[in-house]
A protein has these predicted regions:
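Conserved beta-hairpin
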Residues: 2-33, 40
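Non-transmembrane, membrane-adjacent beta-strand/coil modules in membrane-associated proteins
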Residues: 23-30, 38-91
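Context-gated lysine
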Residues: 5, 69-70, 102, 113
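An N-terminal domain-start capping segment
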Residues: 1-2, 107
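Terminal and domain-flanking low-complexity segments
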Residues: 34, 45, 79-119
Length: 119
């Protein structure tokens, strides 16, 4: 677990007003909290076959733009050995996101949830 690839930048999520930004060293995504249709904290990625259209999948992490057979278009920021997985469904795509710690993931979930119901 001590081996860290130099290219891995921890994913960050920030919420500024209604604007949610997810940044990583590879690709960034932003959307408005108004666009969130569904928000879940999952134990792992859904059982689906995901095809990469623009991104990186090295067996440890999925990063970038993917399409799931059932899920449809998605944005992945997932370390495969991290749990839980935050699933944020917008009208355009679903974002899957893991955090470095379980607590961080739960905080992000709570923060998004609070913003969703502010509107």
């Amino acid at each position: 677990g001590l081996f860290i690839r130099m290219d891995f930048v921890p994913v960050q999520m920030t919420i500024d007003g209604t604007q949610v930004s997810i940044t990583s060293g590879y690709t960034d995504t932003s959307f408005s909290t108004d666009e969130i249709l569904d928000l879940q904290l999952l134990d792992s990625l859904p059982d689906d076959s995901f095809v990469r259209s623009n991104g990186s999948a090295d067996g440890h992490q999925l990063l970038g733009v993917f399409r799931g057979k059932k899920t449809g278009p998605c944005r992945m920021y997932v370390e495969l050995d991290e749990s839980p997985v935050l699933s944020i469904q917008t009208d355009e795509y679903t974002v899957f996101l893991t955090a470095p710690t379980k607590i961080q993931a739960e905080n992000w979930y709570q923060e998004l949830k609070d913003h969703m119901f502010d509107n």
